[in-house]
């Protein structure tokens, strides 16, 4: 199923070695749909590296996931939560009294004691105000703490007076009282998380609690909070640099966090009330719950806002951000060359660039990009500079000229300088040739024009796909929004705007509410109405004009970065006249006091900026503030106020208030300490100002912690002036004395070591330095507490965000929390940023030639480090930066290095160079590799990593390494958030997939609803990613995890067969195929059914592995405990293969079942082949309809058809193959008709050929080739065009394992060439004879005697026959020339030389004797051809083997002229008709005796001649067997003048069930016997498949089985080839008779006994001499050279026309 079921509990896999296990039901509530929901705690289980089963599993209860589940999901996944009656067991409710063992009366007495002690402590605390606390008070508090540790008394301490007591104690100036308060709080909080949270919440929500708490009291509460949240949100941020946050900011964050968690608990509790279930409309929230949700959203927005400021994420908002996420499906892999959407094109200027080439941002490292540029760049291409390099600036363009092995290696002609300059590969961006760039510019212009037309409109979330990519996204496009809804803000947008309205002070708040009332018909707006208000967009734009003038700086920054402002602010305000001045006001607010700048106009601000300063412009402070404009004047005024005499408070306080609102000048002042040591005067001035500022209470609210690192830089610098250092010590001592929070900050920055080094340098002569060091040292535990707190708060916020995402998935309700997208953007920030190269390591050492070690990291693939030493002693040592976990370590090599290229590399790790004992990986490098991945995703930090080259290619000694690539972890929160997001997503959707799978297992019809279910889930994730996830990597991580957790398990379940062997999806596809006729029938329910099936299958094959194949690299295999995985990318690696494998396997099974049923029922039908082709075409169309044009499913279709064919018995398979060969023959024969019918025939032929292609590689192909060869021979020897034969063979050529039809077609080409050479040979012979005649013209008279021959006489033919009986060589040559001077219409004779090996000849006894059966003028031509062929065969350059001999056959055809008719006849018919030229009649018996033909062959030839269209009549006579043939009298039946009559005997088809098929079966069974016997004789060792084939062929020819007599009885089937043997081997492998060796698949051995149809035969004769020499058969075609007779005589005769 989806996960793993152990002990009746469902375990969800979350990654390698990680499982989630349902542990406890926490609470229950009523969901938005009115059905109960249950919150389950899922524990994270880790499987140990060693051991299996339960012994290797460790339950980490600190790691858990809280998940709300429906009742159906509980039934499917959490059997432990079900009672005996099948109902969900509710959460356990244990009262406090059940826990303790105290008697009720004793408990009541103790409660009375507690109340009296509380009253006494309050009285004693009020009496000792301002004095030392007396001992009785301390004793009372001590007793109260003891009582507080008793759990049954917890309820007494919930008295409000206890909080008053704790508040008084915590605010007491006496340390012992504050310490006692901490003890009491710890005692009360030791019972359970609920009590602890309640106490913390009650204390933290007290008004102005910060004013009553000192450092120790605040730390006590913070420690309690850290203890309370440590086990709740166990999350590690190791490797991420967290900022230094002072205690007061942390305490504020704790208050916000506790308030948010309290409201969240109230929301969950309110949903569990009984009345909530009776709500008539579950989607509509009640007033109380709606108010709670509003308060929670506002509180969560406040927490996110303060957390962003505390983490200083907002300071990075001005940095250039990555491009916006490209539109498209998050469930499909993004192509590398996807062009950005229109918004990106509008935001950035369009550079000239060609889409053909990849930018540098798409590569993981500079080395990889340099290799790409080196391999792609060609001379003449345009390039652009990406970095500043010496004389060339970034952005300069030029033309690439050449490259070499130097440094830098690339020469470019730069347009900016007008000359060439050398740069590095990785600094260039390829633009392409000029024509490519121009095309790109035109495309950019067109895109810009389109963008300009749609500017100001809301662009769609994605673009329509072209028609060639139908179903490219797994969901339908969202429905058009309601016009009325489009005119109003969504609830989330309104609540985000409402958040800023609630931030306003009283008068401003009332003014904004007044604006709302005026635009909403004066409706009275209370909190409940505000929460559900429908605000028009125009009103929201007016509010966005009003709010910036009334918000403080912090809130204004939040407003500018929020979603609603970005969506409706700039676009809506662009046409407003007040907009420019408003923007100026906002910029001024970011620099100066908001209230003051709001009153000043733009001109006043410019005048103020141009006023000359009152002080000398040459002072260091003046020069410092020059770049800050009006904002810098605050620092000058502050210095003047501090240096003036008299009362300074009135002058300094307003300036400090301005700095609190706008701290940039103050931060600049402190950061000036991190300037060069030469600025001594500036440093002293700044330190004097800072030291005086500390004495003002208002100054403590300034962000000192954000710039303390500048003080640390000055403190650590060895060149800092002693006076500056002393002033810095004074300042820091004063700052830490006033607020110990900053001592904690200094401790976190390592100030203790820096102060110790300064004391050591100045010999201890720094005043207050030791005291400052001791103070910093005492805050060590507080620094640890602060780090823990910020981790817990951040982890808690992430968990709450994940909880809101889960609620969004479950309830389909929008997320209405302000700044939710901002928080996710910062968490995902840096998802495309990696620690690269030199940021990972400190130094690189090599075994030899250290002066060339820099070549390993110079990003130049043409340079290299070459070792110098003995083989196997070369190594590269990497000293890693502390805490860096290697994500990928890659070695760059080059195959051109030949023997210098590494062949085996071992990577070791250790804590020092002397302890490199742990082998991390070993890799064998392929000779063709260029990038060798050595390590991936290490989970442990190794200070030292050594790469050892153990062996080189071709036994080389020294090695060459082209470069190193080291990728470290991503130094952002993205890896942590990705892990948590993927875990929660995986758990949620795997639980849901299990529930859906159980539904479909119980009722297959629920499969029809699966597509809508999946569509809803995937569409929701897509919309969430479009709204909240900022970049492609984050969206792809979510999409892949969702797809793997939801779709992959569902596919696995619906494709798994049940007890009957049928899977749910297979049943659905069967129904689809069986009801094809109802697809387009609107009157039936078919279209809706088919639509659902198609939508489901299109959805399931949505993700397809379309990435380019990876380069040829060596794949590392991590070993042992150092094995590591990036489980978050499991969806990428395993998803497409698993889903596609399951779906294709299911489709193959369905096709195999369909085809098998068809073959079983219809294999004997006369129209079997057309119906099969039609069925196959339906299957093909269905595959395209269901799965699109995907090769995997087409292959599954073919494999399914092949599987059905393989199940046929041999004779049935032979019958099927003969039917296909016959059908193809009929279609080719019928294609000669012409016209539309010919096109229809060709279309049917093409359809049949597609179905025949399935035979390729199957055993049936051998049988099919046998029959196709016979029918093709008859066609080639008839009047059929050979081009069609070639086209057919080109398409189904793989179906002929012996390639006999191809050889037959090749022999025709060879015959044509021989015919051309024979024509030249005849001309040469004629030239020689004419030359002789010229020399002997008196002895020979030319042409007169021969002109009297008008017809052939029987005497001449008899004489010629007599001359052949006793023939000598000279006589043969004389006979060869007897028709050279024949003056009649010489027929054209074409001879086809056919190879006996490839052409099927029925029997060699049917041979033609030209001496007896042909007239002299034809006989001489054949004799000359025989002489010509013998001479050509005897030529040493043409034939070096045994000389072939010719044997004439009766095969072939001819054209005869009979009156006005042209007769197309066979060779036998030609002989018969010519034989009747001078005979009135001839008996069939005499013809048989004279020709030596068989009766069947002669009767087959006589049949068409005696038909109604034939020229002969057959007269039956009693005394003459077979009858008498006579020429039909043509006077009775007038004939047309140029009538063409086809009399060639029709095609004779073989029967697979006859003798021919039985011989094929005998041959196959004999081969099976031989294979089994030979493998039995070799035992378990087996034989190599090539050796087995040779032994079988040898046994077939020489013995010991079968006997020669049986082989002869097989006829043509007795021939055996290696292809036949391989076909039988495949058959036996499929039956399980043979098996392959796992380690050596080319070796076969006998597996199990098998029943083989073995004939009862004897062994072959061992002494046989082998087969006869090969014979070559000949077929002649006769064509007339002259013009046919124009007139016919009364007595018609047959003349040879062709």
Curated annotation (Swiss-Prot):
Gene behind the chain: CUL7
Associated disorder: 3M syndrome 1: An autosomal recessive disorder characterized by severe pre- and postnatal growth retardation, facial dysmorphism, large head circumference, and normal intelligence and endocrine function. Skeletal changes include long slender tubular bones and tall vertebral bodies.
Gene Ontology process terms (BP): epithelial to mesenchymal transition; Golgi organization; microtubule cytoskeleton organization; mitotic cytokinesis; negative regulation of insulin receptor signaling pathway; placenta development; positive regulation of dendrite morphogenesis; protein ubiquitination
Domain CPH: 360-433
Primary residence: cytoplasm
This protein's UniProt keywords: Cytoplasm, Cytoskeleton, Disease variant, Dwarfism, Golgi apparatus, Host-virus interaction, Isopeptide bond, Phosphoprotein, Ubl conjugation, Ubl conjugation pathway
Modified-residue entries (Phosphoserine), positions: 339
Any one GO cellular component localisation term in the record: perinuclear region of cytoplasm
Expression across tissues: Highly expressed in fetal kidney and adult skeletal muscle. Also abundant in fetal brain, as well as in adult pancreas, kidney, placenta and heart. Detected in trophoblasts, lymphoblasts, osteoblasts, chondrocytes and skin fibroblasts.
Organism: Homo sapiens (Human)
The protein's name in its UniProt record: Cullin-7
Post-translational modification: According to a report, may not be neddylated despite the conserved consensus site for neddylation at Lys-1576. Structural study of the Cul7-RING(FBXW8) reveals that both CUL7 and RBX1 are in orientations that are incompatible with neddylation.
Recorded consequence of changing residue 1246 to G: In 3M1; requires 2 nucleotide substitutions
